[in-house]
């Protein structure tokens, strides 16, 4: 094989050579800017390697001459890897002579290396002699100064290194715009004795080709860290508390530890300090006193020292679980079941939390049945077999847990009652029967005596009482009790004692209901300021209807709180619309002398609870089920209809959200909870004048900035409610704090389009969130647009749509009745286990009502009082979907 170097170009005649072998390779390197063409043409190097040096950015052309082979497959190789450069050219000089060219138009440092060409012949690879290509340029940095954070006046070092070719390379250091060192050979280390403020450093590298400047490094001063924030008690028990916090700015020094101080509040003098390494930024406080108020604060430290303490954060440990078991558990058989009674448990120590419901467990056929939750000290057991022995136990519970179980009560299949003792003991039924008969006779006698006395008092009042101290006869008269709903003198007198305004009393006169006219039942939900209970209301025809009673807590004694609570009822009294919750009545619960009565607002019983809890249950409940898009749009139409009615009556709601919309038995949605609503008597806006708990993430921009509320601000909240519905109950602006919402919105950000949300629906949402209130659509426009969208969707079959389930009113279900929903294997229960879709199943909000499966029979004449509407809502939506009703437009 012959090797020759030349500046050969395409068409260059081959140089005279001895007769070549079967295959010959020739590699030539052309540096057109280094050698003139005339000088290169006569260059002949036989078989010797070549070193080629070029400047960065110059062109280079390499060629390879192959003789003794037809159409060779010439490959270029650099440092052992095949070159993928597309700028390659292969030219035949003769049938047995080919020249290949590899062009590098602008050489970079990465192009430097060892090149050769190779050809395969008969399974063997022939390679040429190599060419070493060296690329020269300005220095290239391999190490540059890095940013640092150092204590004030503390010494530190900065490093800089650069390489050629060409060598040598020298380093010059700069501090800002001042030269402070060099030139020094590369690599170079700069020693600095210290700085008192943030300072910038850089280095320059010089060689024969020029100079290069490094990045600018900033040396920051370390400082004490900032105070922690977002201190939260994440988990509480009677003796332990888990605390988490977010660290403040670390002062550009690694945080090493945090200190948590805890003291009893108020006025605690002993402070417990716990030092924990970080991260994580959490701490577990142990050995706390149950049912005790504490305060804690946190600070963190780096190498320079500790941060300031954050503000004190109060918390209270939970009380102890009940320590006593119910006593005197006994049973009475009746035709309808087995009545169980026991003595009420009284807390033994102030550290025990408030006692809650009782839990009853019963065993039959050696199998434990489900536990029952019972309010009060009496339970009626119906789901047992009277032909088999029964064992019953009961305990009391509170927020912490359950107390000890009572002694088991054995009810034999041969006995008429049970006895307390070991599971296999027996008792005679004769004494029990005699005791029951005696109790019945005594109760009947007392009832007759009380009835006779009551008739006299009602007829004449109570007169001619005891004489006064001076011996003179005195006549006392107590007004006869009246149960006439039209003139409830007793309740009116009690209203006078509340100190509420005369205007509010006048509004409530015709909706006052005597306390004796309804019976309170089980607890449906609790909130911060009150609770909701099921009740049976006796109507004028003697029949009973199930209602929900919303009442304030017994320890709320301020007249202002009571008046604010009753104002919501007065507000609801004015509403009469199928998609707006309507007031049934108002009552007062009497208490001991000297204590204010408890106000109660009576509302329709909504079988399926609040819309937010229903949406959550469909997505993350124990048995999730599917809600079709048509159903979700139908929910929005109902809410828009209700808000259209409210806005037409000059009412602004101010708290529109999915949690404040209720689901009736036929699955229609009603707008409810008017605790923040206001009527606009003049103009079209209301300005908030005092501090209240407001739903920040549902508020419009003008409400956040200026406490200004209009119908247009309700439209904004309706857009957020639409987003809640489409996401099946997700929290809006998740991960954004309330204090950050205004800046987030003013920056042009809005809630993102939910998955599976139609573009038309999201466009409506986005219009509701316009920064200019005048650009937001009205509720009439929203209702018509949503009806148009619903009309374009396919009609659901009865098996697909939960709205078609129980549209016709069926028999009233028993307590704990259920509703079958698509995709659910088991019915959901009532308030018993908290797992249903009513509000009882979730975390109760601020006395939100109503919410657990049940039913409310339609009141006679109710339809006559509803405002005239074009069609029943369900009929109108079905006609829209089937194209039988023309769509209106905004």
UniProtKB/Swiss-Prot annotation:
Signal sequence residues: 1-40
Gene expressing this chain: TYRO3
Stretches in topological domain Extracellular: 41-429
Gene Ontology terms: cellular component: cell surface; endoplasmic reticulum membrane; nuclear envelope; nucleus; plasma membrane; receptor complex
Modified residues (Phosphotyrosine): 681, 685-686, 804
Mode of membrane association: Single-pass type I membrane protein
Record family assignment: Belongs to the protein kinase superfamily. Tyr protein kinase family. AXL/UFO subfamily.
Residues binding ATP: 524-532, 550
Subcellular location: Cell membrane
Post-translational modification remark: Autophosphorylated.
Protein kinase domain sequence ranges: 518-790
Protein name listed in UniProt: Tyrosine-protein kinase receptor TYRO3
Source species of the chain: Homo sapiens
Tissues of expression: Abundant in the brain and lower levels in other tissues.
Domain Fibronectin type-III: 227-320, 325-416
Keywords, sorted A to Z: ATP-binding, Cell adhesion, Cell membrane, Disulfide bond, Glycoprotein, Host cell receptor for virus entry, Host-virus interaction, Immunoglobulin domain, Kinase, Membrane, Nucleotide-binding, Phosphoprotein, Receptor, Repeat, Signal, Transferase, Transmembrane, Transmembrane helix, Tyrosine-protein kinase
Ranges of residues in domain Ig-like C2-type: 41-128, 139-220
Side of membrane Cytoplasmic, spans: 451-890
């Amino acid at each position: 094989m012959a090797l020759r170097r030349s500046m050969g170009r395409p068409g260059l005649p081959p140089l005279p050579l001895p007769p070549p072998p079967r295959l010959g390779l020739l590699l030539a390197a052309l540096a057109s800017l280094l050698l003139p063409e005339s000088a290169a043409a006569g260059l002949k190097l036989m078989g010797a390697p070549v070193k080629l040096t070029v400047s960065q950015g110059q062109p280079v052309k390499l060629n390879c001459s192959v003789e003794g082979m037809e159409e060779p497959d010439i490959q270029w190789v650099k440092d052992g890897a095949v070159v993928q450069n597309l700028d390659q050219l292969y030219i035949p000089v003769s049938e047995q002579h080919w020249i290949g060219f590899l062009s590098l138009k602008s050489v970079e440092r990465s192009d430097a290396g060892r090149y050769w060409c190779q050809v395969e012949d008969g399974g063997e690879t022939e390679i040429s002699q190599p060419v070493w290509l060296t690329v020269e340029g300005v220095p290239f940095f391999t190490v540059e100064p890095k940013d640092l954070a150092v204590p004030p006046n503390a010494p530190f070092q900065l490093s800089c290194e650069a390489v050629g070719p060409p060598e040598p390379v020298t380093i010059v250091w700069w501090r800002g715009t001042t030269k402070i060192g060099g030139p020094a050979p590369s690599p170079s280390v700069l020693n600095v004795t210290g700085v008192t403020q943030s300072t910038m450093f850089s280095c320059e590298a010089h060689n024969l080709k020029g100079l290069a400047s490094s990045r600018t490094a900033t040396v920051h001063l370390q400082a004490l860290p900032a105070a922690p924030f977002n201190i939260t008690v994440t988990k509480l028990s009677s003796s332990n508390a888990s605390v988490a916090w977010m660290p403040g700015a670390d002062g550009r020094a690694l945080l090493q530890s945090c200190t948590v101080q805890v003291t009893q509040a108020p006025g605690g003098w002993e402070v417990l300090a716990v030092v924990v390494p970080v991260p994580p930024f959490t701490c577990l406080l142990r050995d706390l006193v149950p049912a005790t108020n504490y305060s804690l604060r946190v600070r963190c430290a780096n190498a320079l020292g500790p941060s300031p303490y954050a503000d004190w954060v109060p918390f209270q440990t939970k009380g102890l679980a009940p320590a006593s078991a119910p006593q005197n558990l006994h049973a009475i058989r009746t035709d309808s079941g087995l009545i169980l009674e026991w003595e009420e448990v009284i807390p033994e120590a102030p550290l025990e939390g408030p006692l809650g419901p009782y839990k009853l467990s019963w065993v039959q056929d050696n199998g434990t049945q489900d536990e029952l939750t019972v309010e009060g000290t009496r339970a009626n057991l119906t789901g047992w077999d009277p032909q088999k022995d029964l064992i019953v136990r009961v305990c009391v519970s509170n927020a912490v847990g359950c107390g000890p179980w009572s002694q088991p009560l054995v009810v034999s299949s041969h006995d008429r009652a049970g006895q307390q003792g070991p599971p296999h003991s027996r008792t005679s039924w004769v004494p029990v029967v005699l005791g029951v008969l005696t109790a019945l006779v005594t109760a009947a006698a007392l009832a007759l005596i009380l009835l006779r006395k009551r008739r006299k008092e009602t007829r004449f009042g109570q007169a001619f009482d005891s004489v006064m101290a001076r011996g003179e006869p005195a006549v006392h008269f107590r007004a006869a009790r009246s149960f006439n709903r039209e003139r409830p003198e007793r309740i009116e007198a009690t209203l006078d004692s509340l100190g509420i305004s005369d205007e509010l009393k006048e509004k409530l006169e015709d909706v006052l209901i005597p306390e004796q006219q309804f019976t309170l039942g089980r607890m449906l939900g609790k909130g911060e300021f009150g609770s909701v209970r099921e009740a049976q209301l006796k109507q004028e025809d003697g029949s009973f209807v199930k209602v929900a009673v919303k009442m304030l807590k017994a320890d709320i004694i301020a007249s202002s709180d009571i008046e604010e609570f009753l104002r919501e009822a007065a507000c609801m009294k004015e509403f009469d619309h199928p998609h707006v919750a309507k007031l049934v009545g108002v009552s007062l619960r009497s208490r001991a002398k000297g204590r204010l009565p408890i106000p109660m607002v009576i509302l329709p019983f909504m079988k399926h609870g609040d819309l937010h809890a229903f949406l959550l249950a469909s997505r993350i409940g124990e048995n999730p089920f599917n809600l079709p898009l048509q159903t979700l749009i139908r929910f929005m139409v109902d809410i828009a209809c209700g808000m259209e009615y409210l806005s037409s009556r000059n009412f602004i709601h101010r708290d529109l959200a999915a949690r404040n919309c209720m689901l009736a038995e036929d699955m229609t949605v009603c707008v409810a909870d008017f605790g923040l609503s206001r009527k606009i008597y003049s103009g079209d806006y209301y300005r908030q004048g005092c501090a209240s708990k407001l739903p920040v993430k549902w508020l419009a921009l003008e409400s956040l900035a200026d406490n200004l509320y209009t119908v247009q601000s309700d439209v904004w909240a309706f857009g957020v409610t639409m987003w809640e519905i489409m996401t099946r109950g997700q929290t809006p602006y998740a991960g954004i704090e309330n204090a950050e919402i205004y800046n987030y919105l003013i920056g042009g950000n809005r809630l993102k389009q939910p998955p599976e949300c139609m573009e038309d629906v999201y466009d409506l949402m986005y219009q509701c969130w316009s920064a200019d209130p005048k650009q937001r659509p009205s509720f009439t426009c929203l209702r018509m647009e949503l009806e148009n969208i619903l009309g374009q969707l396919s009609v659901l079959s009865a098996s697909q749509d939960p709205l078609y389930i129980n549209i016709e009113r069926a028999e009233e279900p028993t307590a704990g009745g259920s509703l079958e929903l698509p995709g659910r294997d088991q019915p959901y229960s009532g308030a018993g286990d908290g797992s249903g879709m009513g509000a009882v199943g979730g975390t109760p909000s601020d006395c939100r009502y109503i919410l657990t499966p049940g039913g409310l029979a339609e009141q006679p004449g109710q339809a006559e009082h509803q405002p005239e509407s074009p069609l029943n809502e369900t009929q109108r939506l079905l006609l829209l979907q089937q194209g039988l009703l023309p769509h209106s437009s905004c």
